[in-house]
C-alpha cells in the first residue's frame, strides 16, 4: 500500500472527530491504529492487559493514571510520545482542536478489559464501580458498560454500595509496581539519533 500523509488523512476525515465520537480507526489487524480528537473529557478509568502508545500530533492532552496506587497526571504536549504500560488505570482528557495517534494491540479471545470509576476522580483512592468486558471495538463495547454505571445506585450516591459495584476477584490485576517514564519529544529523539538512523540501525523508541 501507499504511504499515508497523516495530516491530509485528518483533513479528509475531519468530520469524524466532531463530538461525541471524536475518533476514527485507520487500521485494525493485530494492532488497532486510531486517531483521537477533542474535546473529550471522561470520569472513568480504563484498564487493559496491553500497552498503549500515544503520539500527540496537534494540541496537548492530559492522561490521569493510577501509578502504584496513587493518582498521577501525565501531560502529553504537542509533538510528544508516551508509552503507557499494561494494567494501569488511565483516563484520557483531550481539549478542543487537539488530535493524536493511539495504538493498541488486538485483544486475545479470553482477554478482558476493565472500566472503573472512583469515588473521587482527583484522588482515585477508593473504587466506586467497575466492570470487565471483552473489547473488540472500544467505541462500541464501552457504551453498555457506561450505561450500566449510569443506571447504578453507585452513580447516584457516589458511594460504594452493597450491590456489588466492585469486582472482588477481577480478571485483570492492576499493576502496583511499575513507575511510568515521562513523555518526550519525538522530533528531539529523531534528531538525537539521526546518525544511527541514517546508517540504517534499528533503535527502540522505548528501551
Regions found by a protein language model. Give the residues of each.
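Jelly-roll (double-stranded beta-helix
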Residues: 1-81, 89-207
Amino acid at each position: 500500500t501507499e504511504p499515508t500523509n497523516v495530516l491530509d488523512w485528518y483533513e479528509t476525515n475531519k468530520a469524524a472527530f466532531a463530538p461525541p465520537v471524536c475518533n476514527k480507526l485507520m487500521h485494525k489487524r493485530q494492532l488497532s491504529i486510531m486517531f483521537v480528537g477533542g474535546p473529550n473529557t471522561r470520569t472513568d478509568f480504563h484498564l487493559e492487559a496491553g500497552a498503549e502508545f500515544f503520539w500527540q500530533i496537534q494540541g496537548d492532552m492530559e492522561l490521569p493514571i493510577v501509578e502504584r496506587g496513587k493518582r498521577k497526571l501525565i501531560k502529553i504536549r504537542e509533538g510528544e510520545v508516551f508509552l503507557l504500560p499494561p494494567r494501569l488505570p488511565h483516563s484520557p482528557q483531550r481539549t478542543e482542536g487537539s488530535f493524536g495517534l493511539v495504538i493498541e494491540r488486538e485483544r486475545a479471545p479470553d482477554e478482558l478489559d476493565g472500566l472503573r470509576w472512583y469515588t473521587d476522580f482527583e484522588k482515585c483512592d477508593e473504587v466506586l464501580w467497575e466492570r470487565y468486558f471483552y473489547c473488540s471495538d472500544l467505541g462500541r463495547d464501552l457504551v453498555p458498560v457506561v450505561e450500566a454505571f449510569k443506571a447504578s445506585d453507585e452513580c447516584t450516591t457516589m458511594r460504594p454500595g452493597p450491590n456489588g459495584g466492585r469486582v472482588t476477584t477481577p480478571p485483570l490485576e492492576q499493576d502496583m509496581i511499575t513507575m511510568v517514564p515521562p513523555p518526550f519529544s519525538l522530533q528531539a529523539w529523531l534528531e538525537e539519533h539521526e546518525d544511527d538512523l541514517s546508517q540504517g540501525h534499528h533503535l527502540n523508541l522505548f528501551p
